[in-house]
């Protein structure tokens, strides 16, 4: 197997299966191409919203999002928020998730984030602990729908 290329998303990644890869988390591939491009352009216009993909042989097989939040506290520092970490089922267990997380943590550090946080389900807690994350607090969620 080829080694994955980890990089920022490009418009052409929709043709390489980006939305199908997101289906591993939640249904994404059913949105229209126009809607996908609208979302893509909105994200690309915000330098604090970065989508990272993993590509093997012209196919997107993993992804995550890094949101960089400017803060008034911590002397105007930044917090990195990791969202939507995904690896296609057939590529899980091959350390691709680790490569994606290492890449995005370096990116957060490059953007001067003083910490990077994420929420996860219990079934992947050990993965993040192995990556150096520490349990810190509880998450509360309010669903608007």
Feature locations, PLM:
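A conserved beta-turn-beta hairpin within the catalytic core of GNAT-like acetyltransferases
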Residues: 70-82, 92, 136
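Conserved GNAT acetyl-CoA-binding A-motif
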Residues: 101, 108-120
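Conserved acetyl-CoA-binding loop-helix of GNAT-fold acetyltransferases
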Residues: 87, 93-106
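Conserved beta-strand-loop-alpha-helix junction that forms the acyl-donor binding cleft
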Residues: 117-126, 141-145
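A short helix-loop-beta-strand connector motif used in the catalytic cores of GNAT acetyltransferases and
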Residues: 41-53, 81
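Helix-loop element at the rim of GNAT/NAT acetyltransferase active sites that forms part
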Residues: 19-31
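Conserved beta-strand in the GNAT
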Residues: 53, 59-68, 86
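A short beta-loop-alpha structural element at the N-terminal edge
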Residues: 3-18
């Amino acid at each position: 197997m080829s080694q994955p290329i980890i990089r920022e998303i490009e418009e052409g990644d929709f043709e390489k299966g980006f939305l199908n890869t997101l289906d591993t988390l939640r249904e994404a591939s059913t949105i229209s191409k126009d809607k996908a491009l609208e979302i893509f352009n909105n994200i690309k216009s915000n330098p604090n919203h970065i989508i990272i993909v993993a590509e093997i042989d012209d196919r997107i097989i993993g992804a995550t999002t890094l949101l960089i939040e400017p803060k008034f506290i911590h002397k105007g520092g930044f917090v990195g928020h990791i969202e939507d970490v995904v690896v296609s089922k057939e590529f899980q267990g091959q350390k691709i998730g680790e490569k994606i997380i290492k890449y995005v943590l370096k990116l957060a550090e490059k953007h001067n984030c003083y910490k990077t946080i994420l929420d996860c389900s219990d079934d992947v807690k050990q993965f993040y602990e192995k990556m150096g994350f520490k349990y810190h607090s509880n998450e509360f969620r309010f669903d608007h729908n």
